[in-house]
Amino acid sequence: MEILRRSQDEDRTAGIYPVLDAAALQEMIREAREIYMHDRICRYIAELARASRENTWTELGLSPRGTVALTAMAKACACLKGREYVVPSDVEEVFPCVAAHRIILNMKAKVWHVKVEEVVRQILESTEKPALKTRR
């Protein structure tokens, strides 16, 4: 009871200050949207989405909206790393976070105690990564 009483009296937001304002956030979003994505990376994202829908363990995979979210997150990842372009590892890094809560496992997966994280890993491992040319 004492813990409940004390928690109601405390101001848990005291000492918390914003690290950026709305304008700064909008600027970051704009910068991320301008990140370049090669057609090969776009195809890779589309293949990951297709593989998520056709996987033996899934009832539902990435929808078109989920695919758009994956694209936006890959661009944001590249931007945060200081690059002006997306590489396959950006997609691989964000795919588990974007896909895990969108993939619905089928009954077979539930019976066999397959975890969505395993399916996400399987999709990443079985989908061919695009080869991008490096400048010499």
Annotated model-derived regions:
Residues 8, 36, 49-56, 78:
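Alpha-helix capping/termination and helix-coil
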Residues 15, 23-35, 52-59, 103-110:
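Short hinge/gating elements
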